[in-house]
A protein has these predicted regions:
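Membrane-water interface of transmembrane alpha-helices
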Residues: 67-84
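Individual alpha-helical transmembrane segments in multi-pass integral membrane proteins
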Residues: 59-72, 178
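Generic alpha-helical scaffold signal
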Residues: 20, 39-45, 61
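Polytopic alpha-helical membrane-helix bundles and their juxtamembrane interface segments
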Residues: 2-35, 39, 83-87, 91-153, ...
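Amphipathic alpha-helical packing elements
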Residues: 49-53, 59-63, 163-164
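Short, flexible micro-motifs
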Residues: 61, 79, 173
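Hydrophobic alpha-helical transmembrane segments of multi-pass membrane proteins
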Residues: 42-56, 70-72
Length: 201
């Protein structure tokens, strides 16, 4: 079990760039929960820093994930700004159960295939958890950009899995950051559910 003192000491020892990336990440998730288009520039800066940090730290899957996040940050900003310029909001939509099952099925298959590759090449300390977090994060970021209501529920699960991954690999500071991400994902879920209900009324 992770000692609270270990977490505090790890946070105090965070390198400057990791601290900046963490703060940018917090700003991103808060703004995303409020449906602000300005979440995306913060996301771009956050993931740019993490791409470099994870690559230098020999975590290629996490570096690849953050590189993808950079592209999605550009896509999300263009998409959300387009609707603001047209004075129309992207409506929050809810997926049917069949779409959610398909989402989970595709994500699971891709995760298993990726984990098999990671296990065979021995480039990950925790291949199955690493693969699952990466694949579902990639898929779920698209749901966020398209304002699919269920994305926050998935983020809660993904971020919880990421916490376990970073604890296993002794990235305690990043694990602590993802505890905050999980809490903010609950806030995002509540806010978006309220907006979705308002849309229907």
């Amino acid at each position: 079990m992770m000692d609270s003192n270990v977490v505090i000491n790890a946070l105090m020892a965070m390198p400057a760039w990791e601290s900046i990336a963490a703060l940018l990440g917090v700003a991103y998730i808060i703004l995303a929960a409020k449906e602000s288009k300005w979440c995306w520039p913060f996301a771009f800066a956050n993931t740019l820093i993490y791409t470099v940090l994870f690559w230098e730290g020999q975590l290629p899957m996490q570096a690849l994930l953050n590189l993808y996040y950079m592209g999605m940050a550009i896509y999300g900003y263009i998409l959300w700004r387009k609707h603001v310029d047209n004075e129309s909001d992207i409506l929050i939509t809810s997926w049917s159960y069949s779409k959610q099952i398909l989402f989970l099925l595709v994500g699971t298959i891709l995760s298993l295939v990726t984990a098999y590759f990671l296990e065979k090449t021995a480039i990950s300390q925790s291949p199955y958890l690493d693969a699952s977090v990466t694949i579902f994060s990639i898929m779920n970021t698209w749901l966020l950009a398209r304002k699919i209501l269920q994305n926050w529920m998935y983020w809660i699960i993904i971020d919880s899995a990421a916490i376990m991954l970073y604890i296993q690999t002794e990235y305690y500071a990043t694990a602590a950051l993802f505890v905050l991400y999980t809490i903010l994902a609950f806030v995002g879920a509540i806010n978006w559910q309220k907006r979705f209900n308002q849309q229907k009324s």
